[in-house]
Amino acid sequence: MTPTASSRDASYVLTLEEIGNLAKNAGKPAETLMNVVALIAKRFQTDVCSAYLLEPDRANLVLAATVGLRPQCIGTLRLALHEGLAGLVAEQVRPVAVEQVKTHPRFKYFREAGEDAYQSFLGVPLIDRGVLQGVLVVQTMAARAFLDEEVRMLTEAAAQVAPVVSEARTLDRFIAPSQERLWSLARNLWWSWDQESSGLFLDLDPKRWRQLNHNPISVLGEIPMSQIERRSGELVLHGRINYAYRRQREYLNADRTWGARHAGILRPRPVAYFSAEFGLHESVPIYSGGLGILAGDHLKSASDLGIPLVGVGLFYGQGYFRQHLDGNGWQLEEYLQTDVSQLPMEAAIGTDGAPVMVQIETRGGAIRAKVWRLKVGRCDLLLLDSNVEGNAPEDRELTSRLYGGDGRVRVRQELLLGVGGFRALRAMGVTPGVLHLNEGHSGFAVLEAIRSRMQDEGIGFDAAATRVSREVIFTTHTPVPAGHDRFGADLIEEHLGPLRESLGLSHEGLMAIGQEHPGNGEDFCMTVLGLKLSRRANAVSALHGEVSREMWAGLRPGKSEEAVRIGHITNGVHVPTWLAPQMSRLYDRHLGAGWHEHSAEARIWEGIENVDDGELWETHLSLKSRLLDFVRRRAMDQAERRSEPRGAILRLGGVLSPDALTIGFARRFATYKRANLILADIEKLALMVNDPKRPVQFVFAGKAHPHDEWGKRVLQQIAELMRNAQFADKFVFVEDYDINVGRHFVQGVDVWLNNPRRPLEASGTSGQKVVLNGGLNLSVPDGWWAEAYDGLNGFAIGTGRTHSNMNVHDTRDGDDLYRTLREEVIPLYYERDHDGLPRGWIKRMKRAIRTLGWRFNADRMVMDYTLKCYVPAAGGTSSDMRMKL
């Protein structure tokens, strides 16, 4: 039966009012849901109205309430998102109306539901607070062409129903509360830095947890439902689930945060934080190295502090490469496709209720990208994905890998990140008050922001650029000129020509924005763009600030380096992410209640001096033992994969002594990091590692860029030591360096070795993670260590002298490294008292924790950005950090 035009509006409006009343006066959510679908069927004059809910795995729909279909199917009728018309609605997150269902290619007949009599179908998504909850469906026996107005009104009805559905999914009988709460924990990366939550997933199935790369969505998806039901019903585990879930809710809903007190101006217009990569957790492989890890830590601390901030990046379908070494120690690269269904991501929904899709015009055609949304605590991370229908094959591959391809691929990736990222924000109704560019890769976002301001306010380029630049923060990480992205004029015109025209700029005018000396034929430099179109620019350590001001002095010819107003905010690390559980419990006992929320305050860390030396040392030895077990296990797995003899595999199970001084090195095998500096004098090294009274051993990990032959040769040098009789038990290289490997290393080493060629390390953060866990740094005074080392909180390689001759520089540093090991590090480690404790070493551990723990953590870093950059850029109180004029 089709409603008449005269009855349609009144009946629909009444339906919306009554749905609101039902939701307001709800008893049990499931009962309310049944009443709602009955009311909709009556008012829309349809024969069927059904509500399908997404199951916790978000891969299937389950029939939750119906009028017209067989009631015994409630809770039992399931369909995957790729099945049927209801699945199509959920998959595309948009309404689907079909007059004759049997003619549609996605039609699927569910006999048990008794739906063979129904011909027409209208389904709309149920969305609550931007999250898809399920699908609302009406069906009729007679063929019916649903009008646009009817689709709109059912969509509005669904908006009223969605909150009821959201509550029902958690509380009602067809989805067990404990299971739903586990899925709720898994779908927000907050679990990754909450030790109680990650421990829950480990305890559900320890073997699967390790095999599935610590991915809770994969674990929950693979564990049989009966096992989850049985385990979650155990009294102790049930209580832990409820406790973790309650803490997550309290965390997400907290309003008394540091950000609420100090960054309220950002709430209506948040910070948009752009980065080419984000290192959040090993199970989300969209990072390659330090830049991504820093970005991930920045988001996590912004979440903890309550800073209104949205991350913007790219979704790399194959991530960075997986590393294996062949029998000769040569690096091999393998790229694996990431299964999106195993990640805690959902399609980003725009203000129009549809999935966000952005499009960027170039001279060669349009590039399109869909947008994923990932929850990082209180913060959203938007990830653009070019692997969509309608793109040319080369464009579908744009976001497949990090840092792959030539300059043409790179400029297209950066166009997608900057311009596409800004458009994605606007499509979601986010108008950022601050743009923070984490390196130059995202610099095109500023040009798009200027275009948008010109259009919104009806002003010209110069006026718009002036206004936008006040809101831009630019962070540079690269201390060498060759490391900055540069693109030729032809590439810029091919890809930015349409944008340039909308900005009202000539080709020369656009190129000048990215040239240090306009008009001399230079390529377009992304860092120059960032420096010119930002009010505030910063380096990432004090020394790096000096290097950057010298490097970019040409931007202010005739002025002193000090006139190049690049300030610095030294990097820090997210304490909960990198702190071992054992050390966290030790701090809980001795630093005072709530120390986590005040970790950027020096007074908190003074409590480390009250820790008993024996307790601290035993905690460290426990972590060291865990590291060595991990390294042995990985070494055996590597040998087995290479089909090495059984005896050789078993021998690896006994390498590395828990009593030996253990030095760790894990990072990119870039040339300037000099991973092989310790090999400068192989005879001295052999004597050192084989000293029967004071032995030293090394654990290494790291990746060389696929195109870096030098880096691969250095890596091979180190790997070959595992087959050298002099070093076989004292050197182990762990393949496939990732966040998991890094976490084990920084939590368990005695000494962290860092020997870059000064001043080429912008900051570095791995040594900061070591400090938190009781390890000591042995480093060239470069990057963060140049301002951190006080003579008693670690060890320095040399005095910071440099030399224009690289060979002289390296030889001098190599000699200083051996001398420091021989005269300072090794004697102090092995000097024991009558209790067997290295009191001098422990004293240095405590001093490192006390003097560095508060200074070099991401909470302090994000607080600095907020007070010195974000708030002033948004129009708040000015800062004392250097402002770029």
Where are these regions (language model features)?
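Short beta-strand-to-loop transition segments that serve as allosteric relay/switch motifs
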Residues: 69, 135-144
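Allosteric cytosolic regulatory segments
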Residues: 155-162
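Helix-loop-beta substructure at the N-terminus of cytosolic sensory domains
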Residues: 23-64, 73, 83, 168
